[in-house]
Amino acid sequence: IYQGDVVYSPEFTFSTADGTLDEQLAAYQAPIYPDNYIAIADWNMRGQWNLANVHDPTVVLGEDGYYYMYQTDASYGNAHEGHGHFHARRSKNLIDWEYLGRTMKELPGWVVPKLNEIRQGMGLQPVATAAEISYGFWAPCVRKVRNGLYRMYYSITCPGLLNGEGTWSERAFIGMMENTNLSNNDGWVDKGYIVTNASDKGFEFNVTAGDWANCYYKWNAIDPSYIITPEGAHWLIYGSWHSGIVAMELNEVTGMPKQSLGIPWAEGNAPAEYGQLIATRQAGNRWQASEGPEIVYNPQTEYYYLFMAYDALETPYNTRVARSKSITGPYLGIDGANVTEGADMYPVVTHPYKFAKSEGWVGISHCAIFDDGNGNWYYASQGRLPESVDNAVMLGHVRSIRWTKDGWPLVMPERYGAVPQAAITEEELIGDWEHIDLSYVFGQQKESSTMTLTDDHKVSEGTWKDSSWSFDAENQILTVNGVDLYLQRETDWEAKPRTHTIVYASYTDNKTYWGKKSK
């Protein structure tokens, strides 16, 4: 674990002023740390990482007032290798992040024995412990259980094939650790095995090259998300690709499965105790590009929200959301489609994009959703620079969420930068905007175009040219061509020097829009 004092370079600063919100806004200074962090990507520069080298984050607000972030083992140039697993950092303001180091020293002792126990039951030869670097340590989820108790559910993928060439890949596990004090990064105590991949194919684990549709596993035991319902029930939501996302109830005291788990191979049906299907892109499809479920409950709307990552992580990654009144579904999209029975999930929440005067961002998904306890909600994920720059750069992104009148979460297009939220006036809306139709196109970085609002409430340029606009000052909503655009002040990360601007986000039944005011 990193024991030294946190070290921020001069770039990692921001400030606001005392006084009224208008005075604070006038004095606002934006964060100026670099998006392309290659110069500080090395392990010996970790004290300056801030949000560099973040992938698949999970965020929890600790009792000490810090936000703690944990993540997949991934970094530019694999800088983390040999330094433990599920690395952590913390922040008081969601902008300046202190590196804390690993939470897990080495591969848990239960993994290989549990793997061989399952292999023995399947009539397969035992395996030896492989080099630690060959295991995957992926996608943790950390939640507060109560004062003085936190749980981390984590994924470990095992190397190799089930029975040599021509057979399916080895299984994965979800395990769990507990901690009583998040500021003690050495305080995580491993509690062991939770669940593994479940199959409905018995011992039919042979596979031909490229035959993904005939996947041996039905449920994939990675990408856990953990929730405690208002009634006090504990649930684990997990899954990646394969047949979809499942919900498994947990014992609220131990955090272990509520039902005893039988053998993870069966014929005809996957064992029911391994989970109940809550989301699938296509019923019966055993290899579908969806993963990274994140489940939250909003007491104001009384809905459960299931966020998902779609497509491959390098560039096409995009985020979707559906909602339900019940933890086990059915989950419906904004278009009314039942994703529990099988449908593509809408709306699109994030998508590869590009504002002018920038390279833009891709791979923006596998998110964490969290709130500050005061009604303010946030979205965190990695973002990657496009391949034309360096797609291996993975920077942590934190964005604000606004909720629509109909109870859907809108993620703001610009990253959070603690901009004072002085009321937006109608006069500020007149002029040029960068407008993005963020509707889904596989792997395409959606670019902005100019939209001009005139002082006579007309649109003189852009997609909605010759339409009219109006402004609801009380609710801070700009309506253009009948579409409600939810406004917020955020940092203009593309400006040089960075400053503040006004942004918007919007959903219709089949469209997502992002935009920002041009300077």
Please report, for each region that a protein language model flagged, where it lies by residue:
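Carbohydrate-active catalytic/glycan-binding domains of CAZyme proteins
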Residues: 4, 10-519
